[in-house]
Amino acid sequence: MKRLTILGSTGSVGKSTLTVVRNNPDKFKVTALAAGKNIQVMAEQCLEFRPQYAAMADEVSAKELRQLLIEQGCKTEVFFGEQAACDLAALNDVDQVMSGIVGVAGLLPTLAAIRAGKQILLANKESLITSGRFFMDAVAKHNAQLLPIDSEHNAIFQSLPEVIQRNLGRGDLKQYGIANIILTGSGGPFRHTPLEQLAFVTPDQACAHPNWSMGRKISVDSATMMNKGLEYIEACCLFNASAAEMEVVVHPQSVIHSMVRYQDGSVIAQLGTPDMCTPIAYAMAYPNRIASGVEPLDFYSLGTLTFSKPDYERYPCLKLAIEACHAGQAATTVLNAANEEIVKIFLQNGISFTDIAIINRQVVEKLNLSEPQSIEEVLQIDNLARDLAIKTIRSFIR
């Protein structure tokens, strides 16, 4: 039985992870849960799965959770703060760590799991976007194992030879006959919206993804295709891919989750119903297979699968992310931090949908920084980018 810490248990990925545990109670034991401030959901999870430990982001939330659990006779020990999340990620009696905290807040707990030599189920793409080189070096140094959870990277992982699966970030794609990696994306809910109407898109409209059930921040990133741009950066890092070895394809049906094209002309793809429980179950059981609880793909009802090139006029955030990827780690860190702050204000109705790309580009172009030489420098760049993004946003506030 594998013992599990879930970082970000009350979020979308965390809930899906617990669904897989629920469907496979003989294979997994939840040892620890960590979350932000969603006390009610965390309490429900603790009462159902009875973890030994739980952590909340702040002392007030932890105190309320502790009281709720005591009243229900639950003996879960409750802690708070970033260090608590790091400690739970590195527990001696844990085998797997689900890294599901959204944003750069997930970086240090994920690194703690790596330094403890854990098997890391990586849903926190920001860890690679901001700290890719240091992150992958730490994985190798501490003999940790990385398994990607994003549906696209999980699909690519499944389509690669085992020798690359077990040597992420270091394998030579060409040596193993791989021509390029094909990253698919739905294009979000505004593929056909007239460009002049995009400025009037509301947060609720941007969060209504046609295929996937996700959190609000990642739903907005999907609508701008920033999410695909961040996944492009992550894929280059995970699979040691150059610009010439990467391709982005818009695939509205979200049935093919990504592909690998080989030098002999073969293309290997991973298909499935759009549900995060599938890649999560794959990673949790790797190299075996278990029930995910997801409805099997019905080929008779699929209809037509379509593909097109991304329109950079419609998706300027995708173009910016690809440019940042090949500019270096400082640029990707700036972009990620700025985008988090910008999307936060958009979700509060503070700026327009089209302002997201404009402000992101302004921040990236203004902050032309040298490459970071440590995690500490990455976090400094992150803070600088957030400060500049917040200042820049002020002139756009409606």
UniProtKB/Swiss-Prot annotation:
Residues holding 1-deoxy-D-xylulose 5-phosphate: K125, S151, E152, S186, H209, S222, N227, K228, E231
Biochemical pathway: Isoprenoid biosynthesis; isopentenyl diphosphate biosynthesis via DXP pathway; isopentenyl diphosphate from 1-deoxy-D-xylulose 5-phosphate: step 1/6
Cofactors required: Mg(2+); Mn(2+)
Key word Hydrolase present: no
EC code(s) of this entry: 1.1.1.267
Keywords annotated in UniProt: Isoprene biosynthesis, Manganese, Metal-binding, NADP, Oxidoreductase
Catalytic activity: 2-C-methyl-D-erythritol 4-phosphate + NADP(+) = 1-deoxy-D-xylulose 5-phosphate + NADPH + H(+)
Example GO BP: isopentenyl diphosphate biosynthetic process, methylerythritol 4-phosphate pathway involved in terpenoid biosynthetic process
Family label: Belongs to the DXR family.
PANTHER family: 1-DEOXY-D-XYLULOSE 5-PHOSPHATE REDUCTOISOMERASE, 1-DEOXY-D-XYLULOSE 5-PHOSPHATE REDUCTOISOMERASE, CHLOROPLASTIC
Protein name per its UniProtKB record: 1-deoxy-D-xylulose 5-phosphate reductoisomerase
